[in-house]
Amino acid sequence: MKLQTILKRLQKLHPKEIDLSLGRVFRLCKKLGNPQNNLDCISVVGTNGKYSTIQVMKSILDESNINYNIYTSPHLKKINERFVYNNKEINDEDLAKLLNKIEKINNGDEITFFEILTVAFFYGAKNFNKNINLIEAGLFHRFDATNILEKNLVTI
C-alpha cells in the first residue's frame, strides 16, 4: 500500500460545502473510541510562531528526558513531518498503515484532509498515551479539528 495513493484518496473526501463545526471530527473519533480523551496535550494556537514554540518545547522535553508526540501542519517536505510519536517522525510504512485504518473506519464519509489527519494523529498517539502531546492548531482554534481535547493541560 503506497502512502501517496492513500493521501490522494483522503483528499477526495473533502466536503462540497463549508461547515466550520467539529461534527465530522467528533463522529470519526467516536468510531475510534475517542482516543483524544486519554491524551495529555499542550495546544499551541495563534497566528505566528506556533511551530517555533513547539520546537522550543520539544527541546525542553528532550533535555528533561520526557517523551513526547508532536502534531504540526503544514509539512515542508513530507507529510510524515506532521506525525512525531515517541520522539521520532513516523516512517512511510507506519503512516500508510495508520491512515489506511482511519480511512476504513471513516467509510467514505465527507471530512477535510486536515480533519482526518488530525484524527489519525490522535489515534496513533494512543499507543504512546503516557507521552506529552504538543499539538499545533490549524486556522481557527475554536472550530479547529485539534480543539476537541478533554485533557488539554494548557493552551499557549
For each predicted feature, which ranges?
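Non-catalytic interaction surface on structured domains
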Residues: 8-12, 30-40, 57
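ATP-dependent carboxylate-amine ligase catalytic core
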Residues: 16, 22, 26-37, 63-150
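Conserved beta-strand/loop subsegment of P-loop NTPase cores
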Residues: 153-156
